Amino acid sequence: MMTLSWQWLVMFLLLAMTTTSATTMRNIMYLTGQHPIIPNDASLRAPITHLALAFMNSNIFNNEQHSSSWPIFMSVEEARSEFEPGTKIMVAIGGWGDTSGFDTAARTEDSRARFARNVASMVRDTGADGVDIDWEYPGGNGEDYKEVPNEEKAWEITAYPLLLAEIRKALGPNKLMSAAVPGIPRDMLAFTADTVSQIMESLDFLNVMTYDLMNRRDNVTKHHTGVQLSLDSVNAYMANGAPADKINLGFAFYTKYFRVEGESCAENPIGCPTGLMEDPETGADLGKTGGFSWHDDVPEDVRGSFEKTLDKGQYDEQGGGYWYWDEDQALWWTFDTPAAIAKKFPLIVEEKRLGGVFAWGLGEDAPDFAHLKALNAGIERLAKIKDEL
């Protein structure tokens, strides 16, 4: 009887450990080459479950010959030494404007296999725990959408799941694989009811980029990372078959501002016409948009306006975002404060039962790391709620 009791106890403990591991919320940070800054405070690093080094260029994985070096701003070994044991270190491939490598890779069965073999070799050589595929975006609407029309990229919609499947096959089942995916529905060309289930077969999770939801392609003011627009993003993926527990909500550790031409936005600041912000022929920025991370110096020409934004800005309870309209400079400001970050946990993460969160990017929040603290606090709050259930 004693032996049987001990056997049951061991089984119970193993089950408890498995359940705890399975329900641990992901807290993913991108560490970027632009701001490769890691907090010195160990208590800020401890809640981070995954670190994604961004970026490695997609083109290098199309080489026929196996590479002897994998250029990135920080080695996996160095990154691992900075974080708690057990933190998963991933390599992010691609990024905004890096589409040609993916285009080449996805075209044929042979090119997909070559790309996948090289990705697997990189993971093995660097000691990474996995990869994040950041193709912006399969099917079109990327940086080059005026140069290469979407109809010329329509084939990528069916090729994208095939490329992911080939990478997963090469990596094997024990390495992590994620994808950073668009937050704006108009950019979700490759993420349909027909494709999402195929995509999710290859991935451990999706990083939904619920930021930059207002950009130069828009023509009215809105929150660039607001609650309602973020819910629209998450709901779109879930409606097309992505499980909630495989979705990570994106947070932006930076500001955005837009210079509005024409009528004043004083009476109706949200949804106010902005005027043209990109060249209709080339897609180039017309100089009416801007932004900076919390680590960057504030540009001199908007310093005074930004100070007013911090002092007089307000939170929109309906759309769920911090904003300010500067009437004097005709500037629309939109970003998350730590308080705005806190609100997203009950309204989105908890409400939709998401599997985790991520932020772009860790070093962008230096030196105060106020937004990281808010993100960590949200994670810890949800963990306590789960423990009490």
Where are the predicted features?
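Glycan-recognition patch characteristic of GH18 chitinases/ENGases
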Residues: 22-123, 149, 372-374, 380-383
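Short, well-ordered coil/turn segments that N-cap beta-strands
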Residues: 25, 47-49, 85-89, 127-129, ...
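A cross-domain feature marking catalytic cores of carbohydrate-active enzymes
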Residues: 31-33, 55, 91-95, 135-137, ...
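Conserved, mostly hydrophobic/aromatic
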Residues: 51, 91, 133, 167, ...
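Substrate-binding surface in catalytic domains of secreted glycosidases
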Residues: 60-71, 138-297
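Generic structural signal for well-ordered alpha-helices
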Residues: 73-80, 116-123, 157-168, 196, ...
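Glycan-binding loop/region signatures in secreted carbohydrate-active enzymes
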Residues: 93, 251-347, 377-389
